Curated annotation (Swiss-Prot):
ATP binds at G34, K35, S36, G37, A38, G39, K40, S41. Part of the ABC transporter complex MetNIQ involved in methionine import. Responsible for energy coupling to the transport system. One of its GO terms (molecular function) is ATP hydrolysis activity. This is Methionine import ATP-binding protein MetN. Keywords: Amino-acid transport, ATP-binding, Cell inner membrane, Cell membrane, Membrane, Nucleotide-binding, Translocase, Transport. It is a peripheral membrane protein.
Amino acid sequence: MIELCGLKKSFSGKLALNDINLFIQEGEIFGVIGKSGAGKSTLLRCINILEKPDEGEVVIDGQNLMSLSRKDLALARHKIAMIFQHFNLLNSKTVFDNIALPMRIQGIDEESIKQKIEELLPVVELTDKKDAFPSQLSGGQKQRVAIARALSCSPKVLLCDEATSALDPATTDAILSLLKKINELYGITIVLITHEMDVVKRICQRLSVMVDGKIVETTALSNIFNKPESLARKMLYAQISPELPTCLTRRLADYATEKPLVRLFFQGEEATVPFISQTSRELNMDINILLANIDRFDGVTCGVLVVELTANPLLLEAFINRCEQAGITVEVLGYVLPDGL
């Protein structure tokens, strides 16, 4: 559906995109994640040639956009919609007129425009806001208008540029649910860029990680746990791992005591097995659970535990071996000193 081949883009001699090669399947929700300045927005803008790449090919639905005339490119863009962090609504126009704008620019007749908007308003849950102005809407409602406007010309591709980063958590959840519904309802291919792993894990089937203008990893979310060195996996674990309280970190030493502090990452079936209680009995060791969190994405349950063990080096080694045999990732954070030292 979308194929990027050897894409390069530079600004003032500095590479923003460096040899990007990527294939996005028709009908999937694909995430691109990375820190600010990684090149995510530039990549997205190159997909619809808002930024023209210096080198490479952008093939959408079998058509190389880089080789099209200006007129043919304008026609091809009718099937590529885009929403942004900022909603870009016309404040002097009603919800109806904001959604109608792209269709009017294309010369679609008013009766067809009315029918399309009446179809879209229930989808974005704005049936009662047709005559409202942007100043009368919440941030989430404004983004819903922007989404309806993007869908008005029946695109095959929807590009989302940090579309939830200006929204509160509850509204973000609602917008992500809406995007997922749109994907299921219309079969639209969605490309979503973000710096938040939580957004990716909520709705994406596959993702790419960008670092300094390069794609360093592309994977299905369900395969993350099979790749111990996966950067995406590390980003996920960092998100779900509870932060250690100061009262604990100030008591940690890097030399061995008989109170090792260990972080455990579970996934899949391992997250539902009573591993801690079984191991405590079998190794005859005390295991004190200090922090825990569990989450679920793409049908996979994953969790993290921070535990304090009562174990000498040999017993700690036996514990780590048991974890590894069970498919549990282990990280020794340090050794707990007695309180007051």
